[in-house]
A protein has these predicted regions:
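Active-site mouth loops of central-metabolism enzymes
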Residues: 1-17, 56-57
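Non-membrane alpha-helical structural segments and their capping/turn regions in soluble enzymes
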Residues: 9-16, 40, 44, 91, ...
């Protein structure tokens, strides 16, 4: 069933063909997940084809090898802080990040940490009345709304968040490691994970950055419209107020 929202690839030619098909269909971006399970030839073919078609490539960063390979392949942006409950990024990855961000000719390396979903889980678990807000119902049929509501009747039992109590304490350290490495951080959300909806997640990401991690508010504001428009190569149309 996953073929409806993610495509596996079987060889470099298949990778190129699928990226080209997506490009011809008008997508704005190519997203990698589990690319540490692809061959380097497959992954390189996909990245090269995306860039050939003017599309940025975003890569998951849940596992160390996803980051290493993404840096070697030249992806444009990483998503999530990743590495589960590990306390920090490995030294070799930090060295690779510093090497990449030092290359001004390649432009910025972007990173979208998506921290608020994990950071706010325990609060939401203990204050579930927030989920009564119906702003997330927009555009959904009643049957889907009912199904979603049933899915979080017992938020303390959701398997997705089992490791959150030991993952949350690692988020700020990893966030600061990335900032110190010189990546350009982007405001983005992981809307779609349990109890996280597009209608509320963005301001909560701002809140964690500024009020929990101490990011300057103006830097956080630029990380939402301006830098994402640069990463998406649409800054001539979006991203600034003038």
């Amino acid at each position: 069933g996953t073929e409806f929202y993610r495509w596996g690839v079987n060889g470099p030619d298949d990778a190129r063909k699928k990226v080209k098909k997506l490009a011809d269909a008008g997508v704005d971006i190519i997203k990698f997940i589990d690319h540490d399970l692809m061959t380097m030839e497959e992954a390189k073919a996909a990245v090269d084809e995306a860039h050939r078609n003017g599309l940025p490539v975003v890569a998951h960063s849940h596992r160390p090898e996803e980051i290493r390979r993404g840096l070697i392949l030249g992806v444009d942006n990483f998503e999530h802080t990743g590495l589960s409950s590990a306390p920090k990024y490995p030294d070799d990855i930090m060295d690779m990040l510093a090497e990449r961000t030092a290359q001004m000719n390649k432009g910025p390396l972007f990173w979208t940490p998506t921290v608020e979903g994990l950071y706010n889980y325990e609060y939401l678990r203990d204050n579930p009345e927030e989920l009564d807000d119906d702003s997330w119902h927009l555009g959904l049929p009643d049957s889907i709304i009912t199904d979603i509501k049933q899915s979080f009747q017992h938020p303390d039992q959701l398997p997705y968040f089992q490791l959150t109590p030991i993952r949350k304490p690692t988020l700020e350290r990893k966030f600061n490691q990335l900032r110190e490495a010189g990546v350009v951080m982007l405001i983005g959300t992981d809307s779609g994970i349990p109890m996280k909806f597009h209608s509320q997640s963005t301001w909560k990401e701002f809140d964690v950055w500024v009020n929990e991690f101490g990011v300057d508010p103006m830097l956080a504001i630029r990380a939402a419209p301006y830098w994402p428009s640069k990463m998406m190569k649409v800054d001539n149309e979006y991203g600034t107020v003038s």
